[in-house]
């Protein structure tokens, strides 16, 4: 995984390679999926949950640039793998399910870093309001049906996401835009 998926795709940050080399992906999938835990695409976990491809997590960590003074929120896809990768790299780590964010679940008021372990169609206020001023967010973003890795920063109370690269990130349907009729 380190040599054939991460390094060949430009993920070379030592802290990313060290963490991904030390956390066994097979511990985060059902017994029947252990043999495909390192495949270069998402592993379905059932019930709409998934373990994203190694490259997705590697690029997310690299773009997040976590620090020990970060208070961090991970919006989970259901595997717990991203949280385990990040835990020793940040000061405080909370996790929440995508459905809980969409439902407006209360929690810590602000975070310096938010990672969304999946792709979203839009960034809801329920999530952007949890990002402190000058805080960072790393997420998958669905644009015209294509998923991309995106980053953002909260400036003057507003978060703008900047797409970085097309990458196969499973969609978190709790963040789908309401369907509207149009010509």
Regions found by a protein language model. Name each.
Residues 1-97, 153-176, 182-183:
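Class I SAM-dependent transferase core
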Residues 102-114, 121-122:
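A short acidic, Gly/Pro-enriched loop at the edge of an enzyme's catalytic core
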Residues 135-153:
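ADP-ribose/adenylate-binding Rossmann-like module
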Residues 83, 123-125:
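Short, well-ordered alpha-helical microsegments
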Residues 89, 129-130, 140:
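Conserved helix-to-beta-strand junction in the class I
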Residues 69, 131-137:
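Short glycine-dipeptide loop
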Residues 98-101, 120, 140-145:
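Short, acidic/turn-prone active-site loops that include or flank metal/cofactor-
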Residues 74, 115-116, 139:
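Redox-cofactor binding/interface segments in oxidoreductases and associated redox assembly factors
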